[in-house]
Regions:
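Catalytic cores of DNA base-excision repair glycosylases
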Residues: 13-22, 28, 32-214, 220-223, ...
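Intrinsically disordered, low-complexity, charged terminal extensions of DNA damage-control enzymes
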Residues: 3-40, 44, 205-347
Length: 347
């Protein structure tokens, strides 16, 4: 670690001892926490399932977006054991609209391992829990803290923002992982480690917000160097939005059907039902296809520029299967449904 990194850690370490971060933030949490459907009592039999499901759903998705999907999912599948016995097609249907469907597949695979190989018990170490599909450092630490009350911090954007503002240093100048690892016992001064995991994330979401933080009601305002700073420096690293351009080719027929395939490698929609998608092709080079429209589709931090083409055909390539534009029983990602709505205008 460089000298600057060491200096930052010393500053924060001194500050932590000065006002006991964990107890102070848990006290705030007790009075201000949101009533979220996955927040069940610590000894509830639903705890493992609800925490596992919510952590997967919350990956790259905001709380307010997740809530209705979580309620719908748990209404259909009430236990982890039932989840492990549900087929992938049905899981994807219940997940439909939430996006990033790889999460749903990982959740299903993880549930099978926990039920069949782990005797319905979640692994208790980070190294073991990370062997489960779809679980990395962040989700692993969150689950160990939430399920087992272990002294853990899930280092999401909310938590990093709080720490960086307390010392008024840019996030990329702080080695958060090393700091938490080396000073874990001093960071956690409460027996309520599970609540601390949620409290610090909740505080970052409701008070120490990315834009327009509520500094005047902040419980740390007496100690926060960001609050005392006249410059109010921008401490977080900007999100890099990637831009991609695609040409999408849709086989359709007179029965209001479209040819789709799940044999694709489109990252965020890998193995989902989609038309033929290719890296953008110059319009002048495309023959025997009708151009329908150009549009943009934003997914998380991606902006997709899409040229949409179609042709009426009785036959389709072997990799494709016919799907009705109006069938609501099949799992169809929102990305594809937006294509459906544009094609409906042709009938």
């Amino acid at each position: 670690m460089n000298r600057e990194g060491t200096f930052i850690i010393i500053i924060f370490f001194t500050m932590h001892l000065k006002f006991n971060l964990s107890k102070k933030i848990i006290s705030w949490y007790d009075n201000n926490k949101r009533a979220l459907p996955w927040r069940v009592p610590f000894h509830s039999p639903k705890k493992l399932y609800y925490r596992l499901l919510s952590e997967f759903m919350l990956q790259q998705t905001q709380v307010k977006t997740v809530i209705p999907y979580f309620l719908r999912f748990t209404n259909k599948i009430s236990t982890l054991k039932k989840l492990s016995k549900t087929n992938e097609k049905q899981i994807l249907k219940y997940w439909e609209g939430l996006g990033y469907y790889r999460r749903a597949r990982h959740l299903l695979a993880t549930s099978k391992i926990i039920i069949k190989e782990k005797n319905s018990i979640l692994p208790k170490t980070l190294s073991e829990i990370k062997k489960l599909p779809g679980i990395g450092d962040y989700t692993g630490n969150a689950l160990l803290g939430l399920v087992y009350n272990q002294p853990r911090i899930a280092l999401d954007g909310n938590v990093k923002r709080i720490f960086s503002r307390l010392i008024n240093k840019r996030e990329n100048k702080i080695n958060f992982e090393k700091f938490v690892t080396k000073n874990r016992n001093k960071l956690f001064n409460s027996k309520r480690n599970s609540d601390f995991v949620e409290a610090i994330m909740e505080f970052g979401s409701l008070v120490c917000k990315p834009k327009d933080p509520h500094c005047n009601i902040c419980i740390f305002k007496k100690f926060c160097k960001f609050k005392k700073s006249n410059t109010k420096n921008k401490l977080t690293s900007p999100i890099n939005f990637s831009k991609k351009s695609y040409s999408i080719f849709c086989y359709i027929n007179n029965n209001k059907q479209i040819g789709l395939t799940n044999k694709n490698d489109l990252g965020f929609l890998k193995n989902c039902n989609l038309p033929i998608i290719k890296e953008k092709i110059n319009k002048q080079k495309i023959k025997n296809w009708n151009f329908l429209c150009n549009y943009r589709n934003s997914i998380s931090n991606k902006t997709l520029n899409i040229d949409l083409y179609y042709k009426f055909s009785r036959k389709i390539p072997k990799d494709l299967s016919w799907y009705s534009l109006y069938d609501k029983k099949e799992f169809i990602p929102t990305f594809t449904k937006k294509i459906f709505r544009r094609l409906e205008n042709l009938y």
